[in-house]
Amino acid sequence: MGRELLRAALDQAEINRLITRYWRVSVVELTSTTQGDLVQLVRDGKANAGDVIVAEYQSAGRGRLDRSFEAPKSTALLFSFYIEPKRNRDDWGWIPLIAGYSVAQSLHAFHAKIKWPNDILAEQKKIGGILIENSIKSSTEILSIIGIGI
């Protein structure tokens, strides 16, 4: 995949048309961080499970331990999504593993691997990361916001 393919603008209407059954996607030109935006929407009660925010550019992307993550405009896939897994509390620890496995499988053509706990590697080089924030909604419910930057 050439870099020119990554420069095409994201088409929010087309994305929603293709996946509208499960997800509601919002594409933004610029944000400080998709993760922060979605966390705030959840806190304000303005987000639903299945909401996704995709950005053309993040000015203050972040990783674990508040490390920064930055990529030039339209050169990276930057998104966060909100889920409410309907699983037993004992299963909540699997969320990061499932997210990492899913990313690696999606990028299998590039021989992607996950380096614990959240780095995405291809040819032994870091090409992205995964950031997961969980909040306990009740004794049996969890909210998860999963951010991915590639």
Per-range role (PLM):
Residues G50-V52, A76-L77, K113, G128-G129, ...:
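Structural motif
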Residues Y57-R62, I120, K125, L143-I145:
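Short glycine- and Lys/Arg-enriched binding-loop motifs that mark or flank ligand-binding interfaces
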Residues M1-S106:
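N-terminal lobe of the biotin/lipoate ligase/transferase fold
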Residues S80-Y82, L131, G147:
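Residue-level recognition of well-ordered beta-strand positions that form the cores
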Residues A71, T140-I142:
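Short glycine/proline-enriched turns and hinge-like loops at secondary-structure junctions
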Residues A99-S139, G149:
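Acidic (Asp/Glu) carboxylate-rich active-site/surface patches
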